[in-house]
């Protein structure tokens, strides 16, 4: 069983955008969709998209959106590699979930340790959250507790 899988096309990204919980951080926006929250009342097209994601048998699915405003290709790729490494390292803690991360400009100046602490704290907060649609963080999360 593959441990980490990425979202492949626009339809999968749109499915997560429409149905996921949101977490707002000053350097990124995190969308999280648990498999258990998927309802059978979704339209047939959305059910097919979800089934195609689920059929890839990964514990954690990850989508990354890094716009050109962030920097040149080497900077965007560096950010994507860092986020994938953090997710791959910790995917055993988060099962049957889809995370989608939309990166903001402030992430460029962030070093790997700070990025890891902020992402993991956000992952944990979202994964353990009640069913709220939007969660906001007004200050930077200082360190990962766990």
From Swiss-Prot:
Query: Cystine bridges: which residues?
Result: none
What molecular function terms (GO) are annotated for this protein? 3'-tRNA processing endoribonuclease activity; ribonuclease P activity; tRNA binding
EC identifiers of the protein = 3.1.26.5
GO BP term, example? tRNA 5'-leader removal
- What does UniProt give as GO cellular component? ribonuclease P complex
Highest taxon of the lineage: Bacteria
Q: Which UniProt keywords apply?
A: Endonuclease, Hydrolase, Nuclease, RNA-binding, tRNA processing
* UniProt keyword Nuclease present: yes
Record field: catalytic activity: Endonucleolytic cleavage of RNA, removing 5'-extranucleotides from tRNA precursor
Task: Please give one Pfam family short name.
Answer: Ribonuclease_P
What InterPro entries is this protein classified in? Ribosomal_Su5_D2-typ_SF, Ribsml_uS5_D2-typ_fold_subgr, RNase_P, RNase_P_CS
The cross-references to NCBIfam families, in alphabetical order and at most eight, read: rnpA (TIGR00188)
Protein purpose: RNaseP catalyzes the removal of the 5'-leader sequence from pre-tRNA to produce the mature 5'-terminus. It can also cleave other RNA substrates such as 4.5S RNA. The protein component plays an auxiliary but essential role in vivo by binding to the 5'-leader sequence and broadening the substrate specificity of the ribozyme.
The family classification in the record reads:
Belongs to the RnpA family.
Complex and partners? Consists of a catalytic RNA component (M1 or rnpB) and a protein subunit.
What is the protein name stated in its UniProt record? Answer: Ribonuclease P protein component
Q: Which gene encodes it?
A: rnpA
């Amino acid at each position: 069983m593959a441990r980490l899988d990425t979202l492949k096309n626009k339809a999968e990204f749109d499915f997560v955008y429409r149905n996921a919980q949101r977490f707002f951080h000053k350097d990124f926006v995190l969308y999280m969709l648990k498999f258990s929250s998927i309802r059978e009342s979704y339209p047939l097209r959305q059910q097919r998209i979800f089934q195609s994601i689920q059929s890839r048998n990964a514990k954690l699915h990850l989508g990354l959106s890094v716009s050109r405003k962030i920097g040149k290709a080497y900077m965007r790729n560096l950010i994507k590699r860092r986020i994938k490494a953090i997710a791959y390292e910790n995917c055993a803690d988060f099962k049957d979930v889809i995370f989608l991360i939309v990166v903001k400009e402030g992430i460029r100046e962030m070093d790997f340790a700070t990025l890891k602490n902020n992402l993991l704290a956000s992952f944990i907060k979202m994964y353990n959250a009640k069913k709220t649609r939007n969660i906001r963080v007004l200050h930077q999360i200082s360190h990962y507790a766990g």
